[in-house]
């Protein structure tokens, strides 16, 4: 599974923050491209939530994607690969409730071996999957060869 480079101009949802890596972003809504891959935000400065899955804080694997960088510089998830088990992710939900997630794993996968079921599949409790590009940048295809995925479970 690959993420596409550009996503739609979409309405905002609620803000997210990852203080340990300096992320504070609004979340836009993301769907799928015509090819069936996850859209990503058109802007490198915001992250997006995949509306085909649960909302952050609902039971299951909520997927949030953002860019690592662009020709303009670092993107919202530039430092995502630096997250370690125990780090916290905060999502402000509808009604103002703050959901807190604890990172439990970080992996880098080749895009041609992306574990779609592990990332998008069911989870018994509310979890997050934070996704960005990583690995080596291939200028011939204009894309990174890997995806970095951070796994986090809701603790509050």
Model regions: which residues?
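Solvent-exposed, non-transmembrane regions of membrane-associated and secreted proteins
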Residues: 1-84, 90-100, 105-156
């Amino acid at each position: 599974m690959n993420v596409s480079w550009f996503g739609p101009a979409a309405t905002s949802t609620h803000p997210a923050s990852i203080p340990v890596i300096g992320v504070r972003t609004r979340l836009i809504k993301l769907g799928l491209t015509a090819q069936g891959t996850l859209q990503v935000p058109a802007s490198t400065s915001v992250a997006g939530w995949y509306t085909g899955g649960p909302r952050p804080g609902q039971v299951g694997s909520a997927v949030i994607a953002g860019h690592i960088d662009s020709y303009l510089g670092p993107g919202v998830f530039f430092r995502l690969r630096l997250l370690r088990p125990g780090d916290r992710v905060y999502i402000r939900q509808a009604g103002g409730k703050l959901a807190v997630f604890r990172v439990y794993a970080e992996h880098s996968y080749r895009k041609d071996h992306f574990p779609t079921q592990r990332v998008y599949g069911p989870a018994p409790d509310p979890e997050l999957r934070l996704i960005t590009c990583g690995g080596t940048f291939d200028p011939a295809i204009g894309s990174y060869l890997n995806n970095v995925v951070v796994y986090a479970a809701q603790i509050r």
